[in-house]
Amino acid sequence: MLIRGEDVTIPTSMVGNYPNPRWWDAQFARTWTGDQEPPDALIQESLEDAVAAIARDQERAGLDIISDGRVHGDNYAEQALYYYYRRLGYDLKGGYLGFPIYSRLHAGTLTGEVRRHGAIMVEQAKALKKATGKPTKVQYTGVQALTQATNDLHYKSSRDRAMAIAKAINEDIREVDALGVDFIQIDEFTWPYFFEDWAIEAFNAAVDGVKNAKIIAHVCWGNWGGTPAYYPDETAASGEIFDLTKRKAEATKATATGSIVPKAYEARLDVLNLESCGRRSDDLSGLHVMKNHPLPDNVSFWAGVIDVKSTITETADEVANRIRRLLEIVPADRLGVTTDCGLILLQRYIAQDKLHALVEGTKIVRAELAKAKQAA
């Protein structure tokens, strides 16, 4: 893949959220509010230091692309949802979410127009660019996920709500793009369950006008509480807490790939990134589907080869074996590898070890490809 004019074989990166430095999580003013960001020099300095620490972990592991780590929250729900509620003008009070895996989280409530209340990812992007000279990636929670996780008392339809959220997110994305980040990632972790009829339109609206960065659509089963995601069965009632003990059986008929390919190809994206080796993805997430629905021209495929729902660190050989299997389906010049999802639910030292394994396993396969090319 061509990154900053350099051809990188099987580029490596982590998907997203990462264990924060503990001192940053204890920062009393970390969750500032209002339209001025950050409100003072002390918090600005702390933010930059936290992003630099997370960037340094990635650089030491040898990742090709450095991510922001979603430093704006100290837990998965805060990073993926509640932070956005505050930035988009939600009331943080609301009923339960209607998705089985997230059903014990509360939806934010909308009582008026969606708009940005201060920048969303601009300050993180600035700090990341300052922290590293390597290619950078900034990520956002997807429009479908945010739209579905809303107790709406204002808009007449979910489509109206989605397009309003997309417009607000797009304002921020354009500012981040203008800073010169290399990749902008949109996390659509409810796509494997179903696509709303406006899903692709809203995704494309959110990234409209991006001129510099490559667009990544990250799709996974979700990672709340470390649980494997699942399809609901008839015991699940929308809007209620879903009692796992009453679930009749694990859904096994669908895979992440089978759920989103080829529909996801309609989105304006440069990279499709899927969870591929986790507990719901024992068969590499059903990637055989891509043989019948090949990648569109100029779209790369990045696959998760690190299981973030296990504390066991993969060996380099295990990672290499997963990459070799991927190469049976996706050519090396269009393949990248990542973690399955964010690493925040792990201890930081385990997250560091997993990033090292990701890089070392990729090095093994790169060497094999180089040797085969020389012999040809």
Curated annotation (Swiss-Prot):
The keyword ATP-binding appears for this protein: no
Effect of C220A: Retains 0.06% of wild-type specific activity. Decreased binding affinity for CoM
Binding site for Zn(2+): H218, C220, C341
Cofactor: Zn(2+)
Entry superkingdom: Bacteria
Keyword terms of this UniProt record: Lyase, Metal-binding, Plasmid, Zinc
Catalysed reactions, semicolon-separated: (R)-2-hydroxypropyl-coenzyme M = (R)-1,2-epoxypropane + coenzyme M; (S)-2-hydroxypropyl-coenzyme M = (S)-1,2-epoxypropane + coenzyme M
Annotated EC: 4.4.1.23
Record pathway: Alkene metabolism; propylene degradation
pH relationship of activity: Optimum pH is 8.0-8.5.
Pfam families assigned: Meth_synt_2
One GO MF term: 2-hydroxypropyl-CoM lyase activity
GO BP terms, alphabetized: methionine biosynthetic process; propylene catabolic process
InterPro entries membership: Met_Synth_C/arc, UROD/MetE-like_sf
Family: Belongs to the vitamin-B12 independent methionine synthase family.
Assembly and binders: Homohexamer. Component I of the aliphatic epoxide carboxylation complex together with components II, III and IV.
Function: Involved in aliphatic epoxide carboxylation. Catalyzes the addition of coenzyme M (CoM) to either R- or S-epoxypropane to form the thioether conjugate 2-hydroxypropyl-CoM. Catalyzes the reaction of CoM with R-epoxypropane at a rate approximately twice of that with S-epoxypropane. The CoM analogs 2-mercaptopropionate, 2-mercaptoethanol and cysteine substitute poorly for CoM as the thiol substrate.
PANTHER family: 5-METHYLTETRAHYDROPTEROYLTRIGLUTAMATE--HOMOCYSTEINE METHYLTRANSFERASE (PTHR30519)
Protein name per its UniProtKB record: 2-hydroxypropyl-CoM lyase
Lineage: Bacteria, Pseudomonadati, Pseudomonadota, Alphaproteobacteria, Hyphomicrobiales
